Curated annotation (Swiss-Prot):
NCBIfam families for the chain: HI0507
Primary location group: membrane
Chain segments annotated as transmembrane: 10-32, 53-75, 136-156
Superkingdom of the organism of origin: Bacteria
Membrane topology: Multi-pass membrane protein
Descriptive protein name: UPF0114 protein PA4574
Family statement: Belongs to the UPF0114 family.
Keyword annotations of the record: Cell membrane, Membrane, Transmembrane, Transmembrane helix
Length: 162
């Protein structure tokens, strides 16, 4: 009976596979939105103010960071919790493939969240004159919470590895 439960629990990890596949659909949706934004900007590029163009570029950078985060979570999550990826020898292989454990994945996700939060904060500061001071304060507090959390997770991970 114990053996049955252990095998069933171990096999249940495959329930994560469709979730990771769903993340690839989310990446497709993000890609569509990315190009929608580019196609929206191109006809208006000469009429746009520099600040507006910078805001659009920050939005595109933000989408690229989120896309990278999705790929990282998708691939390393699959490798850590479901099954190892079997990539043919002749094909290009990501340098971190097979090397990222759940601790380093957490740190990379935290660093990505800080980067994404930084982009959002920069976009808000570009329009700071239209944002109430108390809202700006909360945006900075939330961003600093992300930064401190990322540092704390990295520090704790380093302490537990030694």
């Amino acid at each position: 009976m114990e053996r049955f439960f252990e095998n069933a629990m171990y096999a249940s990890r495959w329930l994560l596979a469709p979730i990771y596949m769903g993340l690839s659909l989310a990446l497709l949706a993000l890609t569509i939105k990315f190009f929608q934004e580019i196609f929206h900007v191109i006809p208006n590029i000469f009429a746009m103010a520099e600040a507006d163009l910078i805001l659009v570029l920050l939005s595109l950078i933000d989408m690229a960071l989120v896309g990278g985060l999705l790929v990282m979570v998708m691939i390393s999550g699959y490798e850590n919790f479901v099954s190892q990826l079997d990539i043919d020898e002749g094909k290009e292989k990501l340098s971190w493939l097979g090397k990222m454990d759940s601790g380093s994945l957490k740190n990379k996700v935290a660093a990505s969240i800080v980067a994404i939060s930084s982009i959002h904060l920069l976009r808000i500061f570009m329009d700071a004159k239209n944002v109430p001071d108390n809202k700006l304060m909360w945006y900075v507090i939330i961003h600093m919470t992300f930064v401190l959390s990322a540092f704390a997770m990295g520090y704790l991970d380093k302490q537990t590895r030694h």
